[in-house]
């Protein structure tokens, strides 16, 4: 089947188009929907297979990144969202979307239920907005979005991306293989919570996590902004090296596109 993706929009979300494009390149159908149309009943979550919370600055990050948008969902759509989760479908959140999902409590542990917040995404330790490329490695997690991915090169753009949770939660995440991505160097060596490899001071270098089923993932980096090789900062150098070696640079950064392909393939097992 061709899954349909509900790409959330409204109130400062600004990555809808490139996120929809990523899913389309992976073979999905997409529908960019304003949150008010869901609240008004013009569109229904149940009509989709994947819900996507894109990046941006919802409500200008007032009251904390992702908090106001999460409250709007809690107050109007949370029952629909829980039904969507219980039906076995997928949810993905990138950057501000990860922040929204964190505030909603969507990253349930084996010991918790949906709606219970287990972690936070706090201000970067250097108190600066970080906008550049980083490397992250996949931690052999249970996440359905990341099968076949090891290390990938991907951009970040955030001021509040420092993952934090208490020790008990961290060890439960680790034991259940819910820590999906960690910041690293180009060879996959741990960032050891050191800048600049870890851009925000994230606890144990955590860049992305999933829920206890592996069907709900959030991450701070932006794979939807880095589908194409031409977008990499080193593209011109790589192009020249490839030319001299009579090689061709692949059109896509496959490890980033794979996230969206895995979501589509999940519904075609």
From Swiss-Prot:
Gene3D superfamilies: 3.40.50.880. It catalyses: N(2)-formyl-N(1)-(5-phospho-beta-D-ribosyl)glycinamide + L-glutamine + ATP + H2O = 2-formamido-N(1)-(5-O-phospho-beta-D-ribosyl)acetamidine + L-glutamate + ADP + phosphate + H(+); L-glutamine + H2O = L-glutamate + NH4(+). One of its GO terms (molecular function) is ATP binding. GO terms for biological process: 'de novo' IMP biosynthetic process. Its EC number is 6.3.5.3, 3.5.1.2. Residues 5-262 form the Glutamine amidotransferase type-1 domain. Pathway: Purine metabolism; IMP biosynthesis via de novo pathway; 5-amino-1-(5-phospho-D-ribosyl)imidazole from N(2)-formyl-N(1)-(5-phospho-D-ribosyl)glycinamide: step 1/2. Keywords: ATP-binding, Cytoplasm, Glutamine amidotransferase, Hydrolase, Ligase, Nucleotide-binding, Purine biosynthesis. It is found in: Cytoplasm. Its main location: cytoplasm. Pfam families: GATase_5 (PF13507). The active site is at residues 95, 222, 224, 232. PROSITE patterns: GATASE_TYPE_1. The keyword Ligase applies. GO terms for cellular component: cytoplasm. Part of the FGAM synthase complex composed of 1 PurL, 1 PurQ and 2 PurS subunits. NCBIfam families: FGAM_synth_I. Part of the phosphoribosylformylglycinamidine synthase complex involved in the purines biosynthetic pathway. Catalyzes the ATP-dependent conversion of formylglycinamide ribonucleotide (FGAR) and glutamine to yield formylglycinamidine ribonucleotide (FGAM) and glutamate. The FGAM synthase complex is composed of three subunits. PurQ produces an ammonia molecule by converting glutamine to glutamate. PurL transfers the ammonia molecule to FGAR to form FGAM in an ATP-dependent manner. This is Phosphoribosylformylglycinamidine synthase subunit PurQ. The lineage of its organism: Archaea, Methanobacteriati, Methanobacteriota, Methanomada group, Methanococci. The gene is purQ.
């Amino acid at each position: 089947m061709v899954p349909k993706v509900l790409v959330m929009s409204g109130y400062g979300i600004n990555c809808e188009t490139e996120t929809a494009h990523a899913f389309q390149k992976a073979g999905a159908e997409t529908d960019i929907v304003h949150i008010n149309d869901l609240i008004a009943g013009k569109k229904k979550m149940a009509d989709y297979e994947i819900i996507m919370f894109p990046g941006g600055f919802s409500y200008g990050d007032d009251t904390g990144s992702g908090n106001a948008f999460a409250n709007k969902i809690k107050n109007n759509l949370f029952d629909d969202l829980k039904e969507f989760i219980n039906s076995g479908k997928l949810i993905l959140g990138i950057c501000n979307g990860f922040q929204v999902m964190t505030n909603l409590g969507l990253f349930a542990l084996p010991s918790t239920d949906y709606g219970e917040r287990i972690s936070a995404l706090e201000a970067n330790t250097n108190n600066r907005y970080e906008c550049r490329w980083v490397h992250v490695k996949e931690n052999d997690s249970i996440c359905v979005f990341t099968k076949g991915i090891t290390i990938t090169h991907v951009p970040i753009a955030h001021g509040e991306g420092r993952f934090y949770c208490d020790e008990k939660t961290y060890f439960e995440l680790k034991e259940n293989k819910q820590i999906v991505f960690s910041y690293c160097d180009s060879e996959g060596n741990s960032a050891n919570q050191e800048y600049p490899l870890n851009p925000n001071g994230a606890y144990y270098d955590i860049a992305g996590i999933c829920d206890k089923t592996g069907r709900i993932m959030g991450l701070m980096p932006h794979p939807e902004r880095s589908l194409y090789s031409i977008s990499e900062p080193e593209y011109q150098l790589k192009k020249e090296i490839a030319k001299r070696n009579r090689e061709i640079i692949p059109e896509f950064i496959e490890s980033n596109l794979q996230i969206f392909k895995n979501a589509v393939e999940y519904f075609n097992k």
